[in-house]
């Protein structure tokens, strides 16, 4: 509902939408990578419902999943048609401590033609 409301308000305007969320929190690296991969798979598939379902089913985690899903829904309603995952890493990739990591990902949502 929030995503569609955003789209309705923003229709006809030139906007950039931003959603920010950490991914997995304080899991071992291997578990975090699996959880993060599922959320990022849903993002890459432009599947906001999948982002929400991933956590409900224990297959993924994003603390800001609601904001992420809302922005994906808004972007779809505004005509975006492509998502590209740019990067994924964990805090363990930086610190070397793989026992408890936090996952991070970056993606862009694009519209292939300007209206």
PLM segments and residue spans:
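Flexible, D/E/H-enriched segments
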Residues: 1-16, 26-115
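Active-site neighborhood of phospho(di)ester-bond hydrolases with catalytic His/Asp-centered motifs
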Residues: 18-20
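Catalytic metal-binding/acid-base residues of hydrolase active sites
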Residues: 22-24
């Amino acid at each position: 509902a929030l995503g569609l409301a955003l789209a309705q308000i923003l229709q006809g305007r030139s906007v950039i939408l931003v959603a920010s969320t950490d991914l997995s929190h304080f899991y071992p690296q291997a578990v975090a990578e699996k959880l993060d991969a599922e959320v990022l798979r849903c993002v890459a598939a432009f599947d906001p419902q999948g982002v929400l379902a991933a956590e409900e089913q224990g297959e993924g985690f994003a603390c800001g999943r609601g904001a992420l899903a809302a922005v994906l829904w808004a972007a779809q309603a505004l005509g975006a048609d492509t998502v590209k995952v740019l990067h994924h890493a964990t805090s363990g990739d930086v610190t070397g401590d793989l026992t408890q990591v936090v996952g991070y990902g970056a993606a862009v949502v694009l519209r292939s033609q300007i209206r």
